[in-house]
């Protein structure tokens, strides 16, 4: 019986150790990039709501252009982080996000809300995919990065 408990405890220790090795705290630059992206995404949602409620009224594309500029810088930081970590899936999603940001920027400059909406929707889906695959919430409510 005692031998069985030792084996079970040993297996549990190995599982916990392996799980912990697959996560790490993100760098300050990465954390700032994610926070900047969250703020920009929030600005896009607010601007979209205002845009849709204005009907044929004054339609402001400036918030979309500003958000795209912020996200371009943030996703460049994100891409660099994932390239350094050699996590191909996250690299691909970061590159995809940058393409959606370029489409968002183009739609805003062309003053074409349909393009802005398509790009921001695709960007949200890409962000969600990356978060599901490469982020884990810790017991204290913070996030860590899944490296493996």
Identify what each model region corresponds to.
Residues 20-124, 139-148:
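Extracytoplasmic c-type cytochrome modules immediately beyond a signal peptide or single-pass transmembrane anchor
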Residues 1-4:
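Positively charged n-region of N-terminal signal peptides that target proteins for export
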Residues 123-134:
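The canonical Cys-X-X-Cys-His
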Residues 7-16:
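Bacterial N-terminal signal peptides
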């Amino acid at each position: 019986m005692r031998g069985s408990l030792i084996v079970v405890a040993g297996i549990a220790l190995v599982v916990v150790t392996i799980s912990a090795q697959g996560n790490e705290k993100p760098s300050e630059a990465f954390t700032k990039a994610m926070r900047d992206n969250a703020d920009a995404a929030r600005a896009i949602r607010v601007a979209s709501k205002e845009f849709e409620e204005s009907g044929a009224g004054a339609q402001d594309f400036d918030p979309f252009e500003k958000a795209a500029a912020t996200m371009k810088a943030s996703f460049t930081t994100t891409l660099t982080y994932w390239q350094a970590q050699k996590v191909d899936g996250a690299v691909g999603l970061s590159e995809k996000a940058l393409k959606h940001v370029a489409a968002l920027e183009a739609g805003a400059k062309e003053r074409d809300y349909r393009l802005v909406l398509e790009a921001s929707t695709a960007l949200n889906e890409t962000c969600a995919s990356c978060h599901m695959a490469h982020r884990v919430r810790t017991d204290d409510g913070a996030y860590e990065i899944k490296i493996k």
